[in-house]
Amino acid sequence: MATYKEQNKLNVPHLRFPEFHGEWEKCKLGELAVKVGSGSTPKGGNAVYTTSGHCFVRSQNVGMGHLILNDIAYIDESTHQKQKSTELRTNDVLLNITGASIGRTALATEEINGGNVNQHVCIIRTNGNVEPSYICDYIQTSKIQKYIQSLQTGGSREGLNFEQIRSFPINIPTVEEQVKIAKLLSLINERIATQSKLIEKLESLIK
């Protein structure tokens, strides 16, 4: 087993699945993505939203590691066609890039496939060298969250630009190790979500 100093030298975490060995690759997020970009709010704002059609994802729909779809908006086919460049695909990584929720990230699910995003949500579409779920989880780590905060230099409104997002420092293991890490974190998140729902039910009974 590698010592603490050896782990630092090899650029690997101090806790690791025992069957994996070797150094993790250092790279920038831009090297792992085929798309980094956001959308825009349709002309007319809320007035153009419909009750069905293409999902329109806003920053309030992106939680930390999960989507919040109870108040999802919709746009019609005509509006969608005007924003075709921001069409969502399943497993796109969604990142909030402005305001108080900056840094929150979640994976696009089948439920919002074919939808669009506004200007406050960035789409990160990974290439075949990295698992989208791994990138989504990695952005949630304290390392990247602190990096995001370090990029905010005053002003009345926080924000990330695409160049800054592409500069995120990412350490990646083999795809096999990425998948195992992502599965473990997904299981943990599911249990946290279950416990949160139980707490909400108990609190509603107490009121």
Features from the language model and the residues they span:
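A short beta-sheet element
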Residues: 42, 58-60, 70-140
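Specificity-determining recognition surfaces
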Residues: 45-48, 55, 138-170
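Short beta-strand/loop turn elements enriched in aromatics
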Residues: 49-67
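Short, well-ordered beta-strand elements within core beta-sheets of diverse protein domains
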Residues: 16-18, 79-80, 122-127, 167-172
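Non-catalytic DNA-recognition/assembly elements of restriction-modification systems
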Residues: 14-40, 167
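A short glycine-rich beta-alpha junction/loop motif
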Residues: 9, 114-122, 133, 153-176
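Short amphipathic coiled-coil heptad-repeat segments
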Residues: 1-22, 194-207
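Hydrophobic structural patches
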Residues: 14-18, 180-192
